[in-house]
């Protein structure tokens, strides 16, 4: 590490790119710099308050935590000062000269060109400090850690063009000051009334007093300095809830719904939970930071309190403020606290209550489902206690939906079911198009029986856990024998045809050998000649791919081939006496069935050759 004297460093390459984008692409949203600097100051105060639990001496001098915004019109400077945790020289270099590698690429890829949305991404990716260069020709940072002596302060100065200068300086005050030398066209941010309006707009909920001083203006507290969630619900307007969410989640869009509750009695805590309208960039990274912000007796503990909600609800944003949890609990020990389990159960129930209310508005719920529906399905696997409630929240694409949108509920399915229907039928496929065109649906379409179409990556795994609903079992239309037309006490039509076609079935089995478990006649097909059928307990194609992707070898599973004896190709096959032509046609029927499943052929070239031979034969016969 450098000695402590004046040193000049070059910004990390990603920082240079980021600074260029901010200065040139976010001009119309430049006021957000103040939101970001005050938010950073609030975080620094929060961290000092937490560290002071174990080290009271850190906050013993100057114990009143606050944020001061100062303007000097003559020097054209605006400063944001906190008396929080502060930074060491090493931390300043690490925090202000580089961006965490994990978020840099994603941030740059997510930029849309929409200045309003991109301005929100700044905070979401933890790069809010750099927004200061949108309005400043030069930025100076003065800081001293709470545990450092006065002669170990640090000064950081940059014009944002590629380099920054850093040196160790004398600083009596704990905490950090960010001073901006404003550009000529940024004079509005020297006006007290403009700054008051911005502070109230973006930082009214900050739990520390935000004070404004300078320009002959007497120092005054501008914000309410009381956490929004700590106020009575009756006093809070909807737009206040929305603005708080936007600041909390760094989201340009408002939430779909929220729930604000105070629990009293044996366990006392307040929760304010939000359902976003759009998914965050790292939604599918189960290892990414997640969870609600946790406060204990108004003391900030962590903004990644994942213990309070199950993983499938990781999209929820919000705050939990408890008086129950021990104040000296560490972030690591928090998950061992016996009160956590009870709070997790109650908060999960609260979220499901919210989603049930949201489902009453089909338009809003469609928005929610398009963003988070696949995630909610994880709950069917992980949350046995709430599986029935979650099942009612599911939405599906079915043979009755006009588009490929997942909009049908299981309650709607059961309400429209045939009087004699004894199961909820479903089909797993690679895509909505493949599902709708599947030969497995032909008998169901003829009878007007609705089939749920499942095309999400986890659907087959989910259906191993969701086995019944409303007293009816789920049945996979790709598995086992299926006979929709059999009258009670009568021999199923497919079984009768199976007996009558035994000679044909044996001949086809001899050709296909180990490719299929069995060749039979079934009740599924009407227009198609053949289809593949899974055995009842074999893993489906989706599950096999998931296991393979995870590095596991799936157990062997050999499908059966089901033929439609009424189809012209099957009749021709039955009448074919030439062994070579019979083998070629039997293989073609099998390969067509594989393709209809959306699967890949082992030898596409051989399939093309057989198809060409068949077409040539047909052409020759037609010419005679």
Regions found by a protein language model. Give the residues of each.
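GHKL (Bergerat-fold) ATPase N-terminal catalytic module, capturing the glycine-rich phosphate-binding loop
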Residues: 1-189, 197, 418
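GHKL/Bergerat-fold ATPase module in large chromosome/replication-associated machines
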Residues: 121, 139-163, 183-187, 193-624
């Amino acid at each position: 590490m450098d000695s402590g004297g004046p040193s000049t460093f070059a910004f990390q390459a990603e920082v240079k790119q980021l600074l260029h984008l901010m200065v040139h692409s976010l001009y119309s949203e430049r006021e957000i710099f103040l939101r970001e600097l005050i938010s950073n100051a609030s975080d620094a105060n929060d961290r000092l308050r937490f560290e002071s639990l174990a080290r009271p001496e850190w906050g013993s001098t100057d114990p009143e935590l606050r944020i001061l915004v100062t303007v000097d019109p003559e020097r054209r400077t605006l400063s944001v000062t906190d008396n929080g945790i502060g930074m060491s020289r090493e931390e300043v270099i690490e925090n202000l000269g580089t961006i965490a590698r994990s978020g840099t690429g994603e941030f740059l890829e997510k930029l849309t060109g929409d200045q309003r949305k991109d301005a929100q991404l700044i905070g979401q990716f933890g790069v809010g400090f750099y927004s200061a260069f949108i309005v400043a020709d030069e930025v100076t940072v003065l800081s001293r850690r709470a545990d450092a002596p006065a002669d170990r302060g640090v000064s950081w100065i940059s014009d944002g063009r590629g380099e920054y200068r850093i040196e160790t300086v004398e600083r009596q005050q704990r905490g950090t000051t960010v001073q901006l030398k404003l550009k000529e066209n940024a004079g509005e941010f020297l006006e007290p009334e403009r700054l008051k309006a911005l502070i109230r707009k973006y930082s009214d909920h900050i739990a520390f007093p935000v004070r404004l001083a300078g320009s002959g203006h007497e120092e005054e507290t501008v914000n309410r300095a009381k956490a929004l969630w700590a106020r009575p619900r009756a006093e809070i307007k909807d737009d206040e809830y929305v603005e708080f969410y936007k600041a909390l989640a760094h989201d340009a869009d408002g939430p779909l719904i929220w729930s604000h509750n105070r629990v009293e009695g044996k366990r006392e805590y307040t929760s304010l939970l939000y359902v976003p309208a759009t998914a965050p960039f790292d939604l599918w990274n189960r290892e990414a930071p997640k969870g609600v912000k946790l406060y204990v007796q108004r003391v900030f503990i962590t903004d990644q309190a994942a213990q309070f909600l199950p993983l499938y609800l990781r999209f929820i944003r919000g705050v939990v403020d408890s008086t129950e949890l021990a104040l000296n609990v560490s972030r690591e020990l928090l998950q061992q606290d016996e009160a956590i389990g009870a709070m997790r159960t109650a908060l999960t129930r609260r979220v499901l209550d919210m989603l049930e209310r949201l489902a009453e508005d089909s338009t809003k719920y469609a928005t929610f489902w398009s963003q988070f529906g696949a995630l909610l399905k994880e709950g069917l696997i992980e949350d046995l206690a709430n599986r029935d409630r979650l099942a009612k929240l599911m939405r599906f694409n079915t043979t009755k939906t006009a588009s490929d949108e997942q909009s049908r509920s299981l309650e709607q399915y059961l309400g429209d079911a045939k009087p004699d229907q004894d199961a909820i039928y479903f089909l797993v496929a690679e895509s909505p198009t493949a599902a709708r065109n599947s030969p497995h649906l032909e008998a169901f379409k003829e009878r007007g029986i609705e089939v749920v179409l499942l095309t999400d990556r986890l659907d087959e795994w989910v259906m191993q856990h969701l086995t019944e609903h409303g007293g009816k079992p789920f049945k996979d239309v790709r598995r086992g024998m299926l006979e929709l037309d059999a009258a009670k006490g009568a021999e199923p039509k497919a079984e009768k045809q199976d007996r009558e076609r035994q000679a044909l079935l044996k001949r086809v089995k001899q050709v296909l050998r180990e490719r299929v478990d069995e060749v039979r006649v079934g009740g599924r097909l009407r227009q198609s000649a053949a289809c593949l059928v899974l055995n009842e307990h074999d893993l489906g194609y989706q599950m096999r791919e998931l296991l393979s992707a995870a590095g596991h070898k799936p157990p062997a599973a050999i499908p059966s081939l089901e033929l439609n004896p009424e189809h012209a190709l099957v009749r021709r096959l039955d009448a074919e006496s030439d062994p070579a032509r019979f083998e070629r046609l039997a293989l073609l029927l099998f390969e067509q069935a594989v393709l209809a499943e959306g699967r890949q052929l082992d030898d596409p070239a051989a399939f093309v050759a057989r198809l060409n031979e068949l077409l040539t034969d047909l052409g020759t016969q037609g010419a005679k």
